[in-house]
Design a protein with these regions (language model features):
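C-terminal charged capping/lid subdomain of soluble metabolic enzymes
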Residues: 18, 161-163, 262-338
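Solvent-exposed alpha-helices and their adjacent loops that cap or buttress functional pockets
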Residues: 11-12, 70-72, 95-97, 124-125, ...
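A glycine/threonine-rich phosphate-anchoring loop and its flanking beta-alpha core
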Residues: 91-184
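ATP/NTP phosphate-donor binding region
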Residues: 1-76
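Active-site segments that bind and position negatively charged phosphate/pyrophosphate groups
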Residues: 176-290
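Short glycine/serine/threonine-rich phosphate/pyrophosphate-binding segments
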Residues: 84-91, 112-113, 229-230
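Alpha-helix C-terminal capping segments
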Residues: 88-99, 234-235, 255
Length: 338
């Protein structure tokens, strides 16, 4: 798709185009993509790679590029990269001149199955993840599975964590399929990856269509994220990939669900087994229970000081609640964060 002019011309409007990417992806795909456009005025903004660079300062470089190239409201921002690039580019597009067009071309599995769909954009703050941002829908998402051939194994596994999440909260058949298909997915079998991506996008699109602004239902897609975001923030956004932190968060949320009697031990252990066989971490960092809870209080689902959590009732069904004994949460945090 990177070189398919018919697709690019149909999905990416306007003459003026700012391609936002990072140093890693630029070396692999930027020249190939820019060579696929005819009669366009193209500018480039190449960002440093990594979650630790998902900041207002980095977003400022995108604004600088838009201004320097005299881009107006007819321009389009094209995000070529993973979740960090997509979030920053989308945030810049949402903010510049109060909103210009943008298109996502996700190059990681995590971005293709999750972050490129749904319109969440933003940057991190030292006080918490994604605290600064906007809901802003891309005009198109162009997911080329061929680019996953160059994705590092660790990034592939990180993306699979979000597929596992979709199975946990919405589709037990997807979870069962994942349970059987981990070897094929890790081997990058094209048919398996295409199904995982397609089904994940269907699930997320269904949920977002019912609750775009995350008033209630969409919050189930944050399963594992309240704990996971605390892990990312506590470790400076540079020790764990996003999917790795979310995977740890799902295990912690499943443990709490079990303590509350919502699921039995077999469900919790089955989820852990899938994580282990996927090659995802299963032991949370020892950041301390008090620090973890402090960071959780900055979560966007907090209402009137109450930390709302996404918990499992069974595989394929999640609830959002703040009605749980604080002692159960404290015991869970103490168990996992020491």
């Amino acid at each position: 798709l990177l070189t398919d002019r018919d697709v690019l011309d149909a999905q990416i409007p306007g003459r003026d185009l700012l391609i936002v990417t990072n140093t890693t992806v630029a070396k692999l795909y930027l020249a190939r993509l820019t060579g696929s456009f005819a009669q366009r005025r193209i500018a480039e903004c190449i960002l440093p790679d990594g979650e630790q660079h998902k900041t207002l300062q980095t977003a400022g470089w995108v604004f600088d590029a838009l201004v320097a190239n005299k881009m107006n409201r007819d321009a389009t921002v094209l995000a070529l990269g993973g979740g960090v690039v997509g979030d920053i580019a989308g945030f810049a597009a949402a903010s510049y001149q109060r909103g210009i067009g943008y298109v996502q071309m996700p190059t990681t599995l995590l971005a293709q199955v999750d972050s490129s769909v749904g319109g969440k954009t933003g940057v991190n703050h030292p006080g918490g993840k994604n605290l600064i941002g906007a809901f802003y829908q891309p005009r198109a998402v162009i997911a080329d599975t061929d680019v996953l051939a160059t994705l590092p194994d660790r990034e592939l596994k990180s993306g699979l964590a979000e597929v596992i999440k979709h199975g946990c909260v919405w589709d037990p058949l997807l979870f069962n399929w994942l349970d059987r298909s981990i070897p094929q997915l890790l081997a990058r079998d094209a048919e398996a990856l295409t199904y995982a991506i397609g089904r994940s996008c269907e699930i997320k699109a269904t949920v977002v269509a019912r609750d775009e602004r995350e008033h209630d239902l969409r919050a189930i897609l944050n399963f594992g994220h309240t704990f996971g975001h605390a892990i990312e923030a506590a470790t400076g956004y540079d020790k764990y990939l996003h999917g790795e932190a979310v995977g740890l968060g799902m295990l912690i949320a499943a443990d709490l669900s079990h303590r509350l009697g919502l699921i039995d031990a077999a469900v919790k252990e089955r989820l852990r087994d899938v994580m282990v066989r996927t090659g995802l971490p299963t032991e949370a960092p020892r950041i301390g229970a008090a620090r973890a809870y402090e960071l959780m209080q900055m979560d966007k689902k907090v209402v009137a000081g109450a930390v709302r959590l996404v918990l499992l009732e069974k595989l394929g069904r999640a609830i959002i609640t703040d009605q749980y004994p604080k002692a159960a949460l404290d015991a869970t945090l103490a168990e996992h964060f020491k």
